[in-house]
Amino acid sequence: MAVSLACQAPRTPMAIPPSYADLGKSARDIFNKGYGFGLVKLDVKTKSASGVEFTTSGSSNTDTGKVNGSLETKYKWAEYGLTFTEKWNTDNTLGTEIAIEDQIAKGLKLTFDTTFSPNTGKKSGKIKSAYKRECLNLGCDVDFDFAGPAIHGSAVFGYEGWLAGYQMTFDSAKSKLTRNNFSVGYKTGDFQLHTNVNDGSEFGGSIYQKVSDNLETAVNLAWTAGSNSTRFGIAAKYKLDSTASISAKVNNSSLVGVGYTQTLRPGVKLTLSALIDGKSINAGGHKLGLGLELEA
């Protein structure tokens, strides 16, 4: 109740905070997007005249030679807030997802997710719920298992740029919490700070800053209780023009990653990347990546 009153006090509407999984996402994107080390990857997105979206993805691991692929079809029935999704991958796993949003209550999304593997006969089911409004973002998922369901819950509160979140998982088969995470952060238009504690033993933090319209930077830091090793990394992304950008990152293990993304034409994007081991430049072991995205 106190949260609701606090949200009504300002004259201007407060922003909806991100979900717990999206806390610190801007910094993670600078570290992860624009790279594809050790992979040759092709992504194709198309949309039919009837509104059905098709997404096909295929990748080959240059080290192992293993090829993975997936196909996803999605249809949105906007009038009723419904989304139907069918998935398949090369592990021969079939998935079906039905989501309904903003129909039962504004800001509430319910998702029914099932998977089935014909090869093994393994089945899984999950019910997901998410509710968001000014200052508040809640989530609760129930993952069904023969041994007993697992309940995943999360909550994020936001006020004047400050964010506080909690995430938990309760395993009913073991009758105990198997995940217990806390997070605190601060977010403005061009600056974000995020810190988290996972299970009381893993600590992490990240900083994201948009220095200019063309330059974005990020820093991350992580360590584990009882260990003297600290993981540290810095990354940056620079837009050369409206069609091209370069990315670079380095961590305390002397691993240097570089990436180049070029939009060749509308709907065609090429990504080149390389990972260099700074400790053994002459010994080899470096990785290259090639990605092509097609959208029509």
Curated annotation (Swiss-Prot):
Presence of keyword Ion transport: yes
Presence of the UniProt keyword Phosphoprotein in the record: yes
One Pfam short name: Porin_3
Annotated positions of the N6-succinyllysine modification: 33
Gene Ontology CC annotation, any one: pore complex
Positions where Phosphotyrosine occurs in the chain: 80
GO MF terms, alphabetically ordered: ATP binding; ceramide binding; cholesterol binding; oxysterol binding; phosphatidylcholine binding; phospholipid scramblase activity; porin activity; voltage-gated monoatomic anion channel activity
Binding site for NAD(+): 255-257, 273-277
Residue ranges the record marks as coiled coil: none
Protein localization: Mitochondrion outer membrane; Membrane
Post-translational modification: Ubiquitinated by PRKN during mitophagy, leading to its degradation and enhancement of mitophagy. Deubiquitinated by USP30.
Site (Involved in ceramide and phosphatidylcholine binding. Critical for channel structural stability and gating): 86
Function: Non-selective voltage-gated ion channel that mediates the transport of anions and cations through the mitochondrion outer membrane and plasma membrane. The channel adopts an open conformation at zero mV and a closed conformation at both positive and negative potentials. There are two populations of channels; the main that functions in a lower open-state conductance with lower ion selectivity, that switch, in a voltage-dependent manner, from the open to a low-conducting 'closed' state and the other that has a normal ion selectivity in the typical high conductance, 'open' state.
The protein's assembly and partners: Monomer, homodimer and higher order oligomers; formation of higher order structures is necessary for scramblase activity.
Name of this chain's protein: Non-selective voltage-gated ion channel VDAC2
Annotated gene: VDAC2
